[in-house]
Amino acid sequence: MSSSGSSHPFLLTGFPGLEEAHHWISVFFLFMYISILFGNGTLLLLIKEDHNLHEPMYFFLAMLAATDLGLALTTMPTVLGVLWLDHREIGSAACFSQAYFIHSLSFLESGILLAMAYDRFIAICNPLRYTSVLTNTRVVKIGLGVLMRGFVSVVPPIRPLYFFLYCHSHVLSHAFCLHQDVIKLACADTTFNRLYPAVLVVFIFVLDYLIIFISYVLILKTVLSIASREERAKALITCVSHICCVLVFYVTVIGLSLIHRFGKQVPHIVHLIMSYAYFLFPPLMNPITYSVKTKQIQNAILHLFTTHRIGT
């Protein structure tokens, strides 16, 4: 029996074969969800309250934290509903909207990491022009450009989902909706919907990563030319947090993309693990990495707690 995507709900299975353990698995996801909300929420609060953090680098970091919050809020309530409450049905419109926000926020995060690499490149390779290049107006324009690219680029493959017919099954072997999983259920010509995301992965994820890599090659070249050992170390430290975030994000997202596209022989549980690794690890690790590796963030945390302690 076929039905249009706009009228028929989908059924989410969570972890097929592990239904008896769903409640225990949900405890882990709940802990991770709370940690992501707390970490990124705290980071946003610090950047808002501490005027020393009102700089381009931390503006982009605030965008990164907001994106990670958005990704968690988009996926985790559905995951917990499936695993904890056994609420497996999701309306088609909600499913397609979830797929849209998951993929658009992913491309948005890639753009933010690219903008942060540009910030570090200017700060280290051309420090005398930093304030003239990264003016408030230009930083806002970069931020808006990244937002537009992320949210507009995903519209073409998502919009047709509302009009496709879905036959045989409306079951998704997951706890949330991904475009590549939904499209497999459509009984229509989905060539465009399969090719377009692959092109996006190359021209956004891969290209962004290559530009970031090249920028850090140039940064390293500049750092090695600094005579003072102390200044070299100081310059490198300012990049460590960003490099860690870049590695965590691109390893998980490109790994997930490759498995979905070429991993037909890979066990389904591996697909699930890679999906959850992407949705959990970058949002969890980004605030931790910046809190541990960035002196300004550490000072802001101390200032925040000291101020509140004195106030009480």
From Swiss-Prot:
This is Olfactory receptor 51B5. The lineage of its organism: Eukaryota, Metazoa, Chordata, Craniata, Vertebrata. GO terms for cellular component: membrane; plasma membrane. Keywords: Cell membrane, Disulfide bond, G-protein coupled receptor, Membrane, Olfaction, Receptor, Sensory transduction, Transducer, Transmembrane, Transmembrane helix. One of its GO terms (biological process) is sensory perception of smell. InterPro entries: GPCR_Rhodpsn (IPR000276), GPCR_Rhodpsn_7TM (IPR017452), Olfact_rcpt (IPR000725), OR51/52/56-like (IPR050402). Coiled coil: none annotated. It comes from Homo sapiens. Residues 45-52, 119-137, 216-235, 293-312 are cytoplasmic. GO terms for molecular function: G protein-coupled receptor activity; olfactory receptor activity. The chain crosses the membrane at residues 24-44, 53-73, 98-118, 138-158, 195-215, 236-256, 272-292. Disulfide bonds join 95-187. SUPFAM superfamilies: Family A G protein-coupled receptor-like (SSF81321). Belongs to the G-protein coupled receptor 1 family. Residues 1-23, 74-97, 159-194, 257-271 are extracellular. Pfam families: 7tm_4. Odorant receptor. The gene is OR51B5. It is a multi-pass membrane protein. It is found in: Cell membrane. Its main location: membrane. CDD domains: 7tmA_OR51-like (cd15222).
